[in-house]
C-alpha cells in the first residue's frame, strides 16, 4: 500500500487513511463501482490498480500481499478469479474515474470510480503498430535517398 504523503491527508492519521483506502478498495472489488469524493477516488486508483496487478500474477505470495490490504477472503477470491481474469489482456488502466455533480450538503466534488470491464480492442493495437511502422519508414526514406545520391555522385 502506498505510504501516505506528507501534508494534508484524507483522514486524521496515516493509519486511518490506510484503513479507509482498504475499505474503499474492498467495496470497489465487491461492487465494481463506488461513488465517493474526487480526492478519495484519486488516492484509491493507484492502490486498486496495484492490487489488480498482483492478482493477475496469481501466485501464493501475491495472494498474501493482497490479503494484507483486503482482509475479506471472499473479495480476495473474487479479485483473483473473476476480476484478474477479465483484466488479463489489459496492460494497465484497470479503473476509471468519472466526475459527477457535487455532493449535496457540502458541495464536495464527487466522482464514481469503477472497474473497466470492456474488452481491450485489438484494433487499437494494430493501428498503433501501423502508425509506428509508417513513422519508421518515413524516417528511413530520406536516409535511403541520401545514400543513393552519394553513391551516384561517387561513380
Curated annotation (Swiss-Prot):
Pfam families: Ribosomal_L17. PROSITE patterns: RIBOSOMAL_L17. Gene3D superfamilies: Ribosomal protein L17. Keywords: Ribonucleoprotein, Ribosomal protein. The keyword Ribosomal protein applies. It comes from the Bacteria. InterPro entries: Ribosomal_bL17, Ribosomal_bL17_CS, Ribosomal_bL17_sf. The keyword Ribosomal protein applies. GO terms for molecular function: structural constituent of ribosome. Part of the 50S ribosomal subunit. Contacts protein L32. This is Large ribosomal subunit protein bL17. It comes from Bifidobacterium adolescentis (strain ATCC 15703 / DSM 20083 / NCTC 11814 / E194a).
Amino acid at each position: 500500500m502506498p505510504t501516505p504523503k506528507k501534508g494534508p491527508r484524507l483522514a486524521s492519521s496515516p493509519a486511518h487513511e490506510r484503513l479507509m483506502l482498504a475499505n474503499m478498495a474492498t467495496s470497489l472489488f465487491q461492487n465494481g463501482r463506488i461513488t465517493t469524493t474526487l480526492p478519495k477516488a484519486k488516492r484509491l486508483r493507484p492502490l486498486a490498480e496495484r492490487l489488480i496487478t498482483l492478482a493477475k500474477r496469481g501466485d501464493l505470495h501475491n495472494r498474501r500481499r493482497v490479503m494484507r490490504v483486503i482482509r475479506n477472503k471472499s473479495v480476495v477470491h473474487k479479485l483473483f478469479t473473476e476480476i484478474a481474469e477479465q483484466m488479463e489482456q489489459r496492460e494497465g488502466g484497470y479503473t476509471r474515474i468519472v466526475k459527477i455533480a457535487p455532493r449535496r450538503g457540502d458541495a464536495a466534488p464527487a466522482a464514481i470510480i469503477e472497474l473497466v470491464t470492456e474488452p481491450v480492442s485489438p484494433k487499437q493495437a494494430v493501428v498503433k503498430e501501423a502508425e509506428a511502422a509508417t513513422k519508421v519508414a518515413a524516417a528511413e526514406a530520406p536516409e535511403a535517398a541520401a545514400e543513393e545520391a552519394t553513391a551516384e555522385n561517387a561513380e
